[in-house]
């Protein structure tokens, strides 16, 4: 890494320019801290001796005369994208020329590469006496005149060349002005860029002093500005144009009372004495940094970027295509489904109702409020993807630029390369999916480039990075560290805010930080309130972002946004940790040098402070409790930071109190220890680094290392020192041995231990460790289940795991695994197989409807319970119901629950389980749901359980316990409807099928008899059991028995089951006047259907007739299945809708043809011009841009310049051909030269090849899709397209051609026509998939 100050050997020259006389008056050369003989030789100017010239040549090089001359030299164009770049047409002045000899002054103030142009203004002030507000700075770069701000008029850049001052012929107060600016003053906007650009490679700048204009004309100006109109002409036509640092009030003060400027506007005119003092201190400190930089880099470079000393904890990668890409983010959002993998999406676009934000999320996720509430500047889509519970955020703008960001744990030790690699792997499949959308996403063609493509620029920003200085300081040493930063604060290099924490030094590093978003200051939030009135919140749009120099409110916000990068230095026992927040990779390299030069100075030089090198820490002694705990947490945070994994966990300092925490050593430290001391250590494990660690217990009262089990959320064993040594054969000895061998202590270890050591059963009400048992509460065991078992059998609750990663209430899952005697993962795999079924939606009484398919549900089960990759989020409340159903399906096992409500027990059983319990074949398990967790109930003998964990968990029909459960279920069963099995008792009839709805309830039976068609027999929604009667999840069948057969069965049923008598109350008639059924009496009247008949059955003649406008079956079918044969009415609606939108479809084809014709013509001009240009010659380049301006606008010239500056000549032409320019959108102008009749003929000629003609469109078999594209390139199945051409009736085509010609010739219709390029019928209509939730909000 190179860290040099080029301005020491190639100094900055500042030439003063007088616009009134159009002449250069004086040059200041900033030599900086050069040797005395160099300074002396420079100042001799024309009297230099040969010896002086030799000194200057040795110091500045062979071209020393050029560096110290009046020669105008620009930089190489690096990193100046933010400045207003203006193509300089033939100005008559070469940019690289010798100016007439003028006076030269030499300044000893240093210029540094990290100086912003704001810093340069201050240094010009101390050297020349011209305060910042009077400076108009300009310079040349790549033959381009540039200034340090941007002036926009109605959103377009204004040319700013102060050398044109004398060309303005209108005057106010004796000063030349641009009068057009005043008439459009409300449309002016100034964007200050001084703070967002470094001087870097610029070595010659020019300054026009406002005083050269104002001072001679002060009297005339004072008189003129008394008139408001003349004041506005002068301010907007001159001051705001060239000296925008001045507000109107500040300008007025400058004219009337210039000596008051420093008092009234200290930011515009700072105290010269204070500024000189600060800059000299800054110079001293920065010179010291540069002097030591290479030495420090060489000392630490080997470890600077390694995983051990660097940890990126958050980052954003920006991918910038070299070519412009038009991407329809609204359509990408619509076509991209929300899934458990990518559960959240947000889009911002301009809809028919204005700026609009739409968000959607998968039902297993939450609404992305954090992203939908953001402030957007351009149409943007945000996609959030989860991989192993880590969120990756992809933001794509409509110009093809996209950003990838994520966060990591410091312990993962990601460096820059691994961050880029990780984010690239995340992004690639999403980019492929978007690119496959074709014209729907890319209406002008093209695709998003992958991060690996050559046609892109990649930058890393918004990083949070931790780095480590491998030395440790005492408390006094860390205090000294803080005090030494005060000089940097006085020099303005850093800023210290607020209170400081013990052991942490927090400050903002300001110097050289410039990678901010200049637009963030634009919107000012103004809050006002007062007694007796509500708080008012207003958003003010700044017209001039230099307002931070003359408005205290803006200044406060400016300092908040642009005040520097947050740096935290942590005093640690083992090293010094430095955290840097929201930085770029370039800033990291720069800040690292400053910080490590500072830190290294603590241990080198005459004023070094006492430190202990990390490699010499083998002689650690037991320190104070806080420092000892900190050392443990610093070296192995995964082990000692328990709340990292569980916010409710007890902290280590409570589990192992002072003076019991041990001392930890690394392998490197152990190798340097004396053999005798090495023998005292216990080898264990560093969970953070994944390497061995060694422990000792130096405190004499607690000399023996012990390992605590069951306290860490991940079951890691925690070291802690004890008074006595664990004896062989004891429980503690077994735990220590297991922990030292396996590093964890888990369920099976506890089972093994309990088998050896546990001899008693716990009382009910306590938390039950895994594989321990507790007695049932007496009111259940001794009252409810009285006399159901005999001694020595006992009722008990068995302890099982209650949590897993991502699930806080996993007790039911582990209880089911224990009951079925399965490994938990084996259970999850089996029920996942069962979930992957077409009828997945019935699970959990319809909870399965949350998922788009059984495969998706199965995948989520595996990810959550086997791979443990997903957090359940909203599914967390429903997975238990789904699991209970799946266990019933897989193992024919049903569960009943006793829920402990503060000592009162509630018996809970699902309707399906009741049906099972009341059936002849039954198999149940009993589960207790308590405040401490969910546990299975069992019958066992204590000695038998202690020996081999044997117990009975499942109860069947002959078990006495089942009798109790059955009687309780019968009591709870309040269903007064008949039992399905009773139908079997009606001679000649059997239940052929049970019809089940999507909520897993039985709603009807199909009764078989000796007829061909079944009798449709509805029942109240009821639970059902899986028995020998088939079940059917489809719709009500259309082929059913006649009224005669149906009524015959109902008559027999009423006779046999008088308590359930079916009494018709109304006849059902459809719109065809057919009688199709009847409605029965009662609160829950049921719809009985039979085969349609034209004759009213005699048994129903006296009943009222109820007309079914739509058969409920048709509604169900429309919801669940696409219509195979649309209704005639639907055909008519589709056709009408098609005709209404046919003109929009024709416009899409028209613009697609026009894009190709217009763009290809202009591109050929550019290509020919490109091939004729020698880009190595300035005159040839100037001619290239001059001719280019004849047929493209200024913005396109900027784009072409950028491509040429960032791409080699051979590759540039390919990039130009792919790019989208402004000229691609100026399509209609050439057509306006036609007459109406000529244009109609021309349009016919253009569009006929794109049309598939029809005499008429008789039928449209399906509705139009909301997103449409040109039929020529469509990747969507569009009903308006055939053979890649647009279907149009012949009689409509002629009419549309005339309408299109009239619209083209009407200038008021231009914007309306261009908007059709969106390719959306209704931009607020979105595809709504079953598992998605969409919300829309307008942003004003």
Curated annotation (Swiss-Prot):
Keywords: Transcription, Transcription regulation, Virion. The keyword 4Fe-4S does not apply. The keyword Transcription regulation applies. GO terms for cellular component: virion component. It is found in: Virion. Belongs to the asfivirus G1340L family. Putative initation factor. This is Early transcription factor large subunit homolog. It comes from African swine fever virus (isolate Tick/South Africa/Pretoriuskop Pr4/1996) (ASFV).
């Amino acid at each position: 890494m190179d860290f040099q100050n080029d301005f020491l050997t190639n100094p900055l020259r500042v030439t003063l320019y007088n616009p009134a006389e159009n002449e250069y008056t004086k040059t200041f050369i900033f030599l900086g801290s050069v040797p005395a003989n160099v300074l002396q030789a420079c100042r001799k100017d024309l009297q230099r001796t040969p010896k002086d010239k030799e000194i200057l040549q040795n110091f500045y090089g062979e071209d020393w005369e050029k560096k110290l001359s009046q020669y105008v030299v620009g930089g190489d164009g690096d990193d100046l994208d933010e400045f207003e770049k203006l193509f300089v047409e033939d100005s008559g002045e070469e940019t690289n020329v010798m100016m007439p000899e003028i006076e030269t002054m030499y300044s000893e103030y240093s210029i540094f590469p990290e100086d912003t142009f704001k810093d340069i203004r201050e240094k010009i002030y101390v050297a020349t006496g011209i305060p910042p507000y009077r400076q108009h700075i300009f310079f040349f770069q790549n033959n381009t005149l540039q200034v340090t701000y941007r002036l926009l008029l109605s959103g377009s850049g204004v040319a700013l060349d102060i050398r044109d001052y004398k060309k303005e012929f209108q005057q106010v107060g004796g000063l030349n002005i641009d009068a057009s600016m005043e008439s459009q003053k409300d449309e002016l906007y100034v964007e200050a860029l001084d703070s967002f650009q470094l001087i870097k490679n610029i070595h010659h700048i020019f300054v026009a002093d406002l005083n050269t204009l104002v001072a001679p004309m002060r009297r005339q100006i004072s008189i003129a500005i008394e008139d408001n109109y003349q004041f506005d002409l002068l301010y907007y036509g001159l001051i705001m144009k060239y000296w925008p640092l001045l507000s109107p009030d500040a300008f007025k003060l400058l004219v009337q009372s210039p000596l008051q400027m420093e008092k009234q506007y200290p930011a515009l005119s700072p105290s010269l004495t204070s500024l000189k003092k600060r800059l000299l201190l800054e110079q001293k400190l920065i010179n010291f940094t540069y002097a030591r930089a290479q030495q420090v880099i060489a000392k630490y470079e080997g470890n600077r970027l390694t995983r051990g000393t660097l940890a990126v904890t958050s980052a954003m990668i920006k991918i910038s295509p070299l070519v412009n890409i038009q991407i329809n983010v609204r359509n990408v959002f619509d076509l991209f489904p929300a899934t458990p993998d990518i559960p959240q999406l947000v889009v911002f676009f301009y809809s028919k109702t204005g700026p609009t934000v739409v968000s959607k999320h998968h039902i297993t996720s939450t609404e992305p409020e954090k992203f939908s509430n953001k402030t957007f500047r351009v149409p943007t889509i945000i996609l959030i993807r989860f991989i192993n519970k880590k969120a990756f955020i992809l933001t794509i703008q409509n110009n093809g630029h996209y950003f990838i960001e994520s966060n990591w744990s410091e312990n993962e030790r990601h460096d820059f390369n691994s961050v880029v690699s990780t984010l690239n792997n995340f992004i690639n499949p999403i980019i492929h999916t978007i690119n496959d959308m074709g014209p729907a996403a890319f209406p002008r063609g093209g695709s998003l480039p992958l991060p690996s493509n050559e046609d892109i620029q990649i930058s890393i920003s918004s990083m949070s990075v931790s780095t480590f200085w491998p030395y440790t300081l005492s408390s006094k040493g860390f205090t000294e560290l803080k005090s030494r930063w005060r000089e940097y604060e006085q020099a303005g290099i850093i800023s210290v805010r607020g209170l400081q924490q013990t052991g942490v030094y927090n400050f903002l590093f300001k110097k050289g930080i410039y990678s901010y978003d200049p637009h963030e200051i634009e919107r000012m939030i103004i809050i006002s309130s007062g007694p007796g009135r509500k708080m008012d919140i207003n958003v003010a749009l700044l017209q001039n972002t230099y307002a931070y120099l003359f408005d205290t409110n803006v200044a406060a916000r400016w300092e908040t946004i642009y005040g520097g990068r947050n740096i935290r230095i942590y005093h640690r026992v083992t090293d010094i940790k430095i955290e840097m927040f929201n930085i770029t990779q370039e800033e990291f390299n720069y800040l690292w040098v400053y910080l490590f030069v500072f830190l290294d100075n603590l241990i080198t030089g005459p004023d070094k402070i006492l430190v202990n090198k990390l490699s010499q820490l083998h002689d650690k002694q037991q320190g104070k409790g806080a420092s000892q705990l900190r050392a443990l947490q610093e070296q192995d945070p995964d082990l000692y930071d328990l709340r990292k994994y569980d916010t409710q966990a007890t902290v280590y300092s409570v589990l192992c109190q002072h003076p019991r925490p041990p001392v930890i050593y690394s392998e490197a430290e152990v190798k340097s220890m004396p053999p005798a001391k090495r023998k005292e250590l216990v080898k264990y494990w560093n969970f953070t680094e994944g390497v061995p660690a060694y422990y000792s217990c130096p405190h004499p009262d607690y000399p023996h290392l012990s390992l605590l089990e069951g306290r860490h959320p991940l079951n890691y064993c925690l070291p802690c020192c004890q008074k006595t040594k664990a004896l062989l054969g004891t429980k503690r000895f077994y735990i220590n041995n297991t922990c030292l061998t396996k590093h964890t202590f888990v369920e099976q270890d506890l089972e093994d231990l309990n088998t050896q050591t546990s001899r008693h059963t716990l009382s009910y009400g306590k938390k039950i460790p895994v594989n321990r048992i507790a007695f049932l509460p007496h009111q259940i065991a001794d009252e409810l289940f009285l006399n159901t078992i005999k001694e020595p059998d006992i009722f008990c609750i068995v302890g099982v795991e209650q949590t897993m990663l991502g699930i806080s209430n996993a007790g039911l899952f582990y209880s089911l695994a224990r009951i079925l005697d399965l490994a938990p993962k084996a259970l999850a795999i089996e029920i996942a197989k069962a979930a992957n079924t077409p009828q997945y939606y019935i699970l959990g009484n319809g909870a399965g409807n949350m998922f788009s398919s059984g495969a998706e549900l199965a995948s989520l089960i595996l990810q959550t319970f086997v791979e443990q990759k997903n957090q359940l989020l909203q599914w967390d409340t429903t997975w238990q119901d789904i699991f209970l159903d799946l266990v019933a399906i897989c193992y024919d096992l049903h569960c009943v629950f006793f829920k402990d409500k503060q000592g009162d027990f509630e018996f809970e059983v699902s309707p399906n389980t009741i049906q099972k319990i009341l059936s002849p074949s039954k198999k149940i398990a009993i589960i207790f749901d308590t405040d401490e967790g969910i546990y299975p109930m069992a019958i066992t003998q204590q000695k038998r359980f202690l020996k081999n964990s044997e117990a009975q968990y499942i109860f069947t029909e002959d078990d006495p316990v089942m009798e109790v459960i059955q009687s309780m279920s019968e009591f709870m069963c309040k269903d007064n409807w008949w039992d399905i099995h009773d139908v079997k008792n009606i001679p000649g009839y059997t239940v052929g099928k049970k019809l089940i709805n999507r909520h897993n309830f039985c709603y009807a039976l199909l009764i078989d008899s000796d007829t061909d068609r079944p009798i449709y027999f509805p029942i109240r929604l009821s639970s059902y059991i899986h028995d020998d009667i088939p079940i059917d999840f489809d719709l009500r069948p259309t082929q059913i028995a006649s009224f005669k057969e149906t009524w015959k069965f109902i008559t027999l049923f009423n006779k046999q089951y008088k308590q359930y008598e079916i009494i018709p109350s109304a006849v059902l008639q459809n719109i065809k006047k057919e009688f199709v059924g009847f409605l029965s009496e009662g609160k829950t009247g049921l719809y009985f259907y039979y085969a349609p008949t034209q004759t009213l059955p005699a048994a129903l003649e006296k009943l009222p007739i109820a007309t079914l406008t739509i058969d409920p079956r048709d509604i169900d079918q429309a919801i669940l299945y696409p219509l195979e044969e649309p209704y005639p009415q639907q055909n008519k609606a589709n056709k009408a809708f098609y005709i209404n939108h046919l003109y929009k479809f024709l416009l899409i084809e028209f613009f697609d043809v026009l894009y190709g014709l217009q763009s290809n013509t202009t591109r050929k001009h550019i290509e020919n011009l490109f091939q004729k240009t020698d880009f190595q010659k300035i005159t040839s380049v100037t001619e290239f841009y001059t001719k280019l301006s004849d047929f493209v606008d200024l913005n396109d010239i900027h784009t072409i310049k950028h491509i040429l500056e960032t791409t080699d000549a051979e590759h540039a032409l390919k990039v130009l051909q792919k790019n989208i320019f402004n000229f691609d959108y100026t399509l209609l102008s050439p057509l306006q030269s036609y007459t109406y009749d000529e244009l109609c003929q021309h349009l016919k000629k253009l569009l006929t090849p794109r049309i598939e003609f029809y005499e008429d469109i008789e039928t449209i078999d399906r509705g139009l899709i909301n997103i449409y594209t040109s039929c020529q390139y469509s990747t969507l199945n569009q009903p308006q397209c055939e053979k890649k051409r647009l279907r149009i009736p012949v009689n409509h085509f002629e009419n549309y051609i005339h309408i299109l010609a009239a619209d083209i010739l009407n200038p008021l219709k231009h914007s309306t026509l261009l908007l059709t390029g969106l390719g959306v019928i209704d931009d607020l209509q979105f595809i709504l998939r079953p598992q998605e939730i969409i919300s829309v909000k307008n942003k004003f």
